Amino acid sequence: MELIKFPSKEWIHEFKNVVNNSVDYKEAAKWWEGDFLFVIEPDDKLDKKIVMYLDLWHGDCRSVDYFEEGDSLPETEFQYAGTYSNWLKVIEGALDPIKGILTRKFKLVGDKGKVMRATKAAKELV
């Protein structure tokens, strides 16, 4: 199976499929209501900012979208932002998404308390 390049339109759509087929995520996030912008900041391995949108609702990902630098972005309840290299660590399982916030490798904009109550869902999401 060919790996899908991160970040890309194909990747975020496949991510939606994986989330929607995860029984563990559905259980962990059955109460969650909120949308995110996942912001991938440039670093020495990525030369432009990429933003991916996720609409998460009661254990399902209802919609996703992909934006490049300069595109108009939707308003969301949350933004989770970090460098491309740190995003790869999260995707590969080398960095827990919540620990990423606590160690300032990622910045969370939005109700931090709500996200901290959803640590199991956050872990299942990645």
Predicted stretch roles:
Residues 1-126:
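Feature captures hydrophobic
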